[in-house]
Regions:
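Extracellular/periplasmic envelope-modification machinery, especially enzymes
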Residues: 1-191
Length: 191
């Protein structure tokens, strides 16, 4: 019958192809190539390059900054052999995304910089309470003095943060942030 022919010629082959496609998707296409050492090494290199920024040892993103962190030589990138970096990258975890690109620029331009990122804490020189989650506030406050010391030791300050997150918490964020940048500028810093 026509129904049997349709089933045998179309439905069964389409179903078999769908099952094979789903199986290939389920095993992520590994199949025989998983036995290849070249494939495994390429996959490991790819995974290493696509790790989150905070997993790289030269990205100094912390949940709480300590005195040791602001002295950590792994946090200084760019041109080697410069005793005291005059530039600092300061911000929350969003700033960590720029470490690699600023490192490349610094090497080419011949300067070094320190990077200091404090997860979920805005780059402010004042109390961040209105702009952070209550769970993060103790870490933000405990880190503030160390971060201030590192920021004030620099001549040039690059600031990055997840601005929209802090603005969602309070419409006063920009006023407080601009007061911080003005304070830094008044202290002779380039922001």
């Amino acid at each position: 019958t026509a129904k049997t022919v349709f089933t045998v010629q179309y439905i069964l082959p389409a179903g078999a192809i769908a099952v094979l496609a789903l199986a290939a998707m389920y095993i992520d296409g590994y199949g025989l190539r998983w036995q290849s050492l070249e494939y495994k090494s390429s996959l490991a290199a790819f995974r290493d390059q696509t790790r989150p920024a905070y997993l790289f040892d030269y990205v100094c993103q912390r949940q709480r900054v300590s005195a040791a962190d602001i002295q950590n030589e792994h946090c200084v990138l760019g041109e080697k052999g410069i005793a005291r970096p005059k530039v600092i990258l300061w911000g929350d975890s969003n700033a960590a995304h720029y470490v690699g690109v600023i490192d490349a620029i610094a090497r080419e331009a011949g300067f070094s910089f320190r990077n200091m990122e404090l997860g979920s804490c805005p780059p402010l020189l004042t109390d961040p309470e209105s702009f952070v989650n209550a769970k993060r506030l103790p870490d933000c406050l405990a880190s503030a003095g160390f971060i201030r010391e590192a920021v004030m030791a620099a001549d040039i300050i690059i600031i990055s943060a997840s601005w929209s997150d802090y603005l969602r918490r309070s419409d006063k964020f920009l006023d407080v942030f601009f007061a911080t940048t003005q304070s830094l500028s008044d202290a002779g810093k380039q922001v």
